[in-house]
Amino acid sequence: MNRIRTATLALLTAAVLAVSGCTTGADDLGTLVSAPAETATPAPTATAAPPTTDCTPSATTSYAPTGVTDSATLTEIRDRGSLRVGVSADTLLMSARNPLTGTIEGFDIDIAREIARAILGSPDAITFVVITSAQRLPALTGGEGAPPVDLVARTLTMTCDRWSTIAFSSEYYGAGLKLLVSESSDAAGIQDLEAAGDQQVCAPRATTTLSRLENEYPGVEAVAADTHTQCLALFQEGSVDAIAGDDTILAGFVAQDPYAKVIGEPLSSEPYGLGMAADDIDFVRFVNGALESIRADGRWQSIYDRWLGELGEAAPPAPVYGR
């Protein structure tokens, strides 16, 4: 392993461990060095089920806002005085803890704060609950081992399979699945990794990324980790050859590791939606109304420019309604 890269990882780890946060949940940042290597395992490719590709309406189709101002969930939130949102704490640019202030910040966070503003009148009327990728759906369905939340804003791709369990807002960001490799790598895309053979590619458990690796790219060995941060640690110590992830996530990794680069054209489109419980459609309609306002008055653009502007010019995705 590159000695300079080792030093970079050590410095990042030290900065992380120096911070104590006030949010609830299992902070992903704490797993950067404390999680044993055994938590990353080859994915069970033989038993993985391919994602559903045929669904009507489409995965990006949500419920149209109708001007509704109340629902069971909205009443609970207002009585509580705070919107509980499931987030990441280690996805730089999207949702990560600032090592200097201890606060969680990023694109997803600012979008969630605007939803809190719409419900409670203040973007600060919000509680961030740190969850892993695998806890995103259980946190909305009452699944075992996941803290309950009203909303998930954690780079959650809208899929037909997930619609069978939860509900989504309209699409609020369109990401693309890419690969991160060492700066010295000659690979230009995943086909080069497949051709090289014996290449390990890391992705978090319970993600569309891991499923895609297992089912569409048998020429690489998919390695499952609990979090994106664990994938980064495995990559930096030389245990895996690449990380697969959304371009937003990988851009944050490159900002942390100058000895890494993102390669290739997007392997897929990853539309992000805010996750909500499936049994309160009026809450979904309300959130979609809030997103309409965020798009229309320029707040979405300001949030994008602040956090993701280096990825290039972008406009908010057009909402699709019809459920």
Region spans (language model):
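Bacterial signal peptide processing site
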Residues: 23-26
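Alpha-to-beta junction loops
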Residues: 124, 142-156, 199-200, 237-246, ...
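Bilobed "Venus flytrap"/periplasmic-binding protein-like clamshell domains
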Residues: 104-119, 156-159, 174-232, 242, ...
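Extended ligand-binding regions for polar small-molecule ligands
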Residues: 40-68, 207, 274-311
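C-terminal motif of bacterial Sec signal peptides marking the signal peptidase cleavage site
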Residues: 16-21
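Acidic, polar ligand-binding/catalytic clefts
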Residues: 113, 117, 124-193
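Extracytoplasmic small-molecule ligand-binding "clamshell" domains
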Residues: 32-151
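Periplasmic-binding protein-like
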Residues: 173-181, 247, 251-290, 310-323
